[in-house]
């Protein structure tokens, strides 16, 4: 560089070819990455070349060795020895087979031929009596020979695993592959059984056993891959076939070899290889779907043997987390993509139940040593696995597992088929003998040889089989059947539990000893015995739980005696009959406190064990309540006396109320569902035929009920999906409205309607008479037809105001203006005409109260179903406007409207004669074939008889003693459901156009009738007077008005009802008093000329009083004497005279 050179500065600016600093740095970075990539690519290419060269060299060497091997065996003339078999036959064979077939995962025809040759030589050597030639001699020879033998045998196990995976129907040379695999399995079975070795002696037997254990431990390890291969092989079997019988039997026999090594009582950390074999078996073999279906009967007997099941049970219990993790990882690795796939842990449950309970006699023969220990482990294993399965499927549902949004209907059908086959494996649990054997083993002390490091809880859980353990098992089964059984749900389990003799009584006795006070639920007990019965902690007292477990044996003695038909002993007899009805009546003391203190924390406040027991009881008893008739429930009082029914109802009422009030987690959902169902069934039975004090249902909410407006708001806001999980008063009023007094619920109903009217008014809808109201013209003689034609199509718009114009019989418009009163008259007239039996839409029940029920002949009338739907809207309009209609519906019909269950005994109010006949059939002691009944019912319409089958082929099915219950429920179902449902659905559609279904469900059937037609109590004259208006010159102080109220008080209750009907067209008072009568009760003055002496004996007014029912107006002349007013009023209200607007 020239230092003397003068530095020049360019003033021309930056050149377009120059780049910025950031761009230069980015360019340099990119070049650096390119160089790094080039280095990595070069290294990768060198590695690939190295691997390829290695592969080519090994393949070439393997081919050369194979050719030499084939030439050697084709012309060998040397004397065969064990060393020659090992070094010249087996060693090169294992090398080239591994290089040419195993690593390629494909078997060539040439290799199959080599395998056949090698295995035949090896089998010949093994069967030889010559120690110099027998391959097994190496196992008991020198240390070097035994190591060689073990190494080569392990490689044959690996080769066997490979061959098993290739035994699928897609293999071209499947028969040849099966043949060589059968040979190899036969060799391995001999090699793992030293007793079958021809060279075995007393001196070398220990060495042979040691060598055998080495191989068996390798088979049970993950390195061998044997259990994975057996799993893949069995899953390829579509069914059991004779051609694969040998290979299937041999493969499973070899897989069971590790179980026949001397086992400790529990899993032993000192024998990890043996433990691994059991883990592999549980996680890979027992998870095979429908395992039992693929195996021959001989193998099933082997798999269900105690020596196989017991170690499996121990491993699952003590290594639960590890086993479940292995199963989960296996599922992920297999990448199951089938829609609705059953989780693998579910198949473990199914396979264990199928193996342990192949038949009643096979469910652990009592002659086996320590059978109670087997039952303990069996129950704990099923519960452990079931809880894991339920945690996977209950949160999202089985249909959402591995969800494929493009799943077709065929995949859906396949998923249902898989679930049905899975449920079929659980069928033994639904048999009474299964429960009987578990109960027989419950409570017995069991001697357990436990590992000294085992946890205390594990030891304790395995010492006895208690009632709670069995309850947990069946509670889990109920939940599994709910999710997995697409057809019947939990019905198979519930049928068995419900009709098991004495089982439900024993469940309740166990619960009662823990949850309820011992001396009843009285106020004294609640105040003075709180220390004794309080439940301030999450779990029940240890003393009660211990007492429950210790007494479980005694409580099950009666159950087992009923199973076996044995007569109970004296003490047992006392316990068995202690729950029979006595002569005492139901205690109706108003001082009873039915709020159970121990359940005020809801499901969260009780232990998991008791919660499980409670869930099982609720589900089972709810199922039983469906079929219990009134004779059994009220007269015979089975399974419980009415006093205990009260305690059950109070317990459920408290549990559900506080569970909804405080909120519950997903883990309590099943308990709450079953408790709610059981509570509703008891409450509905009590509504129909009371057996509980009214205070019982109100008790939980007596101190915590919110204001009416608040309850209404929370009821409306709460989403349906959050009813059970979100703590709120809205949940309480939605699920258990009966804890609120009826009057308060009516207030809530009115609040709902007021809010709806306000929202409609804000939306611009018409809510009062005016120019924009709906206008209709109705002929007096055709009220129903004209109303149907003009109003049927407007749907929910019927909430708006209706302007009615009547046309008289002469065809002329009637005088007067409609300011709302004519709408009431229209509703009254249309219901009077449509509900008349002569019209044909409704008929009256044959009972004394003459309740309305849809007539079966209505379906044959023109527009019959549409007319009933229209009448639903008319009734909804009356409820919406607060107009009382003097009609009441059958409870069966209302139950359908409210979406509630109808008991078979409700048939007595619908068709008493049919009910008596069905009860006669139910309790008939002779042969029912003598009655010549079949599954049909005969209906008559217009003189024509038609026969309807109660089930397919019913006319050819005779009623017998075996199917009489099916016949009774089929007949009841026809009368209570099939015959009524089309009409109730139509009426419901119309009714809910105006009244929300949620509003209706605040009431029971009896209360619905009261809401529609008013209370059935006597009229409160003072309340009516306070809410009466006077027009035309009358006032409350007028002489005639004072006389009227004196006469009104002097009437009989029936006469007061007639007067009310004369004025309002309804004989009953509004539910919450005359304040809510619409329109308001009015007395209008009708001036009449009378003598001044009329008040003391002269001529009084002769004119009769009249009324305008459309305005609830009584037109009362100015009578001077009480006797005259009484006479004229009675004549008017009993004459049934017609009238027009005046």
UniProtKB/Swiss-Prot annotation:
Keywords: Transferase, Ubl conjugation pathway. CDD domains: HECTc, IQCD. It is an enzyme of class 2 (transferase). GO terms for biological process: protein polyubiquitination. Residues 794-1142 form the HECT domain. Residues 577-589 have a biased composition (Polar residues). Signal peptide: none annotated. The active site is at residue 1110. Residues 567-589 are annotated as: Disordered. Residues 41-70 form the IQ domain. It holds the Pfam family HECT. One of its GO terms (molecular function) is ubiquitin protein ligase activity. Its EC number is 2.3.2.26. Pathway: Protein modification; protein ubiquitination. It catalyses: S-ubiquitinyl-[E2 ubiquitin-conjugating enzyme]-L-cysteine + [acceptor protein]-L-lysine = [E2 ubiquitin-conjugating enzyme]-L-cysteine + N(6)-ubiquitinyl-[acceptor protein]-L-lysine. InterPro entries: E3A/B/C-like, HECT_dom, Hect_E3_ubiquitin_ligase. Belongs to the UPL family. Probable E3 ubiquitin-protein ligase which mediates ubiquitination and subsequent proteasomal degradation of target proteins. This is E3 ubiquitin-protein ligase UPL7. It comes from Arabidopsis thaliana. The lineage of its organism: Eukaryota, Viridiplantae, Streptophyta, Embryophyta, Tracheophyta.
């Amino acid at each position: 560089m020239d230092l003397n050179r003068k530095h020049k500065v360019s003033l021309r600016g930056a050149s377009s070819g120059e780049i910025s600093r950031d761009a230069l740095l980015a360019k340099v970075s990119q070049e650096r990455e390119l160089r790094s990539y080039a280095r990595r690519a070069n290294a990768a290419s060198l590695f690939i070349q190295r691997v390829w060269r290695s592969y080519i060299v090994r393949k070439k060497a393997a081919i050369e060795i194979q050719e030499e091997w084939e030439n050697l065996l084709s012309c060998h003339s040397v004397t065969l020895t064990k060393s020659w078999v090992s070094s010249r036959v087996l060693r090169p064979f294992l090398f080239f087979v591994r290089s040419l077939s195993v690593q390629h995962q494909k078997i060539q025809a040439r290799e199959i031929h080599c395998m056949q040759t090698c295995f035949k030589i090896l089998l010949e050597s093994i069967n030889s009596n010559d120690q110099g030639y027998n391959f097994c001699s190496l196992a008991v020879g020198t240390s070097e020979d035994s190591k060689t033998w073990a190494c080569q045998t392990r490689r044959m196990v690996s080769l066997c695993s490979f061959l098993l995976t290739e035994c699928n129907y897609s293999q071209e040379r499947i028969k040849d592959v099966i043949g060589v695999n059968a040979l190899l399995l036969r060799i391995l079975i001999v090699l793992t059984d030293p007793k079958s070795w021809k060279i075995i002696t007393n001196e070398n037997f220990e060495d042979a056993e040691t060598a055998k254990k080495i191989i068996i431990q390798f088979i049970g390890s993950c390195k061998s891959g044997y259990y994975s291969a057996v799993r893949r092989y069995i899953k390829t079997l579509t069914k059991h076939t004779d051609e694969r019988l040998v290979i299937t039997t041999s493969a499973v026999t070899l897989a069971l070899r590790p179980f026949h090594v001397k086992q400790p009582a529990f899993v032993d950390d000192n024998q990890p290889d043996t433990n691994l074999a059991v883990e592999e078996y549980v996680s890979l073999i027992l998870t095979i779907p429908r395992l039992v279906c693929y195996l021959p009967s001989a193998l099933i007997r082997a798999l269900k043997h105690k020596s196989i099941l017991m170690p499996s049970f121990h491993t699952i219990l003590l290594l639960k987390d590890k086993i479940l993790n292995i199963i989960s990882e296996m599922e992920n690795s297999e990448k199951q993509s089938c829609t609705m796939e059953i989780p693998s842990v579910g198949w473990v449950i199914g396979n264990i139940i199928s193996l342990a309970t192949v038949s009643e006699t096979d469910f652990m023969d009592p002659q086996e040593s320590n059978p109670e220990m087997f039952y303990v482990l069996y129950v704990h294993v099923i519960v452990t696995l079931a809880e894991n399965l339920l945690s996977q499927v209950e949160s999202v549902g089985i249909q959402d597992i591995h969800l494929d949004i493009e799943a077709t209907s065929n995949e859906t059908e396949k998923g249902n088929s898989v679930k049905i086959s899975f449920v079929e494996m659980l069928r033994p649990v639904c048999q009474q003998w299964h429960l009987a054997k578990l109960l027989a083993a419950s409570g017995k002390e069991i001697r357990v040889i436990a590992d000294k490091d085992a946890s205390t809880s594990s030891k304790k859980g395995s010492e006895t089989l208690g009632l709670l353990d069995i309850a947990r098992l069946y509670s889990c089964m109920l939940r599994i059947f709910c999710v997995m059984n697409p057809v019947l749900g939990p019905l198979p389990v519930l049928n068995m539990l419900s009709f098991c003799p004495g089982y439900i009584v024993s469940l309740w006795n166990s619960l009662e000893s823990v949850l309820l006070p011992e001396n009843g639920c009285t106020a004294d007990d609640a105040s003075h015995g709180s220390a004794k019965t309080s439940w301030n902690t999450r779990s029940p007292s240890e003393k009660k739980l211990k007492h429950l477990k210790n007494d479980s044996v005694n409580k099950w003695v009666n159950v087992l005696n009923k199973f076996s038909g044995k007569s109970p002993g004296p003490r047992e007899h006392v316990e068995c009959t202690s729950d029979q009805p006595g002569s005492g009546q139901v205690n109706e003391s108003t001082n009873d406190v039915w709020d159970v203190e121990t359940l005020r924390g809801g499901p969260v406040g009780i232990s998991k064990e008791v919660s499980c027991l409670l869930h099982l009881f609720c589900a089972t008893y709810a199922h039983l309540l469906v079929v219990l008739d009134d004779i059994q429930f009220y007269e015979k009082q089975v399974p419980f006396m009415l006093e205990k029914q009260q305690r059950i109802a109070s317990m459920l009422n408290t549990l559900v109320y506080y569970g909804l009030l405080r909120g519950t987690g997903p883990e309590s959902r099943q308990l709450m569902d079953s408790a709610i169902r059981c509570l509703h069934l008891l409450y509905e039975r009590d509504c129909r035929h009371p057996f509980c004090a009214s205070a019982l249902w109100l008790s939980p909410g007596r101190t915590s009920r919110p204001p009416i407006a608040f309850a209404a708001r929370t009821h409306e806001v709460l989403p349906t999906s959050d009813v059970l999980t979100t703590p709120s008063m809205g949940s309480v009023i939605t699920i258990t409205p009966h804890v609120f007094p009826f009057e308060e619920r009516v207030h809530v109903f009115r609040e709902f309607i007021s809010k709806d009217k306000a929202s409609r008014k804000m939306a611009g809808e018409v809510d009062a008479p005016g120019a924009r109201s709906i206008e209709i013209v109705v002929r007096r003689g055709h009220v129903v037809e004209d109303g149907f034609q003009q109003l049927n199509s407007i749907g929910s718009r019927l909430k708006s105001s209706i302007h009615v114009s009547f046309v008289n019989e002469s065809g002329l418009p009637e005088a007067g203006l409609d300011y709302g009163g004519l709408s009431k008259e229209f509703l009254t007239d249309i219901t009077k005409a449509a509900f008349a039996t002569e019209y044909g839409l409704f008929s009256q029940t044959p009972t004394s109260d003459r309740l309305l029920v849809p007539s079966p002949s209505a379906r044959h009338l023109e527009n019959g179903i549409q007319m009933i739907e229209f009448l639903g809207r008319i009734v909804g309009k009356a409820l919406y406007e607060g107009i009382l209609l003097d009609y009441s519906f059958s409870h069966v019909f209302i139950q359908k409207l409210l979406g509630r269950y109808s008991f078979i005994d409700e048939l007595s109010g619908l068709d008493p004669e049919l009910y008596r006949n069905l009860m006669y059939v139910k309790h008939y002691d002779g042969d029912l074939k003598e009655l010549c009944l079949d599954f049909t019912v005969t209906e008559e319409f217009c003189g024509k008889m038609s026969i309807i089958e109660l089930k397919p082929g019913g006319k050819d099915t005779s009623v017998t003693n075996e199917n009489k219950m099916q016949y009774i429920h089929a007949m009841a179902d026809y009368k209570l459901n099939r015959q009524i449902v089309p009409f109730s659905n139509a009426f419901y559609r119309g009714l809910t156009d105006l009244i929300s279904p949620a509003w209706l469900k605040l009431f029971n059937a009896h209360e619905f009738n009261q809401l529609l037609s008013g209370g059935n109590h006597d009229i409160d004259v003072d309340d009516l007077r306070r809410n009466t208006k006077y027009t035309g010159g009358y006032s409350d102080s007028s002489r005639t008005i004072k006389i009227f109220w004196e006469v009104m008080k002097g009437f009989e209750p029936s006469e007061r009802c007639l007067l009310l009907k004369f004025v309002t067209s309804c004989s009953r008072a509004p539910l919450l008093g005359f304040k809510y009568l619409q329109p308001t009760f009015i007395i209008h003055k009708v001036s009449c000329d009378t003598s001044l002496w009329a008040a003391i004996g002269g001529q009084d007014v002769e004119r009769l009083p009249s009324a305008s029912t459309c305005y609830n107006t009584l037109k009362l002349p100015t009578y001077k004497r009480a006797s005259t007013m009484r006479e004229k009023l009675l004549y008017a209200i009993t004459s049934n005279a017609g009238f027009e607007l005046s």
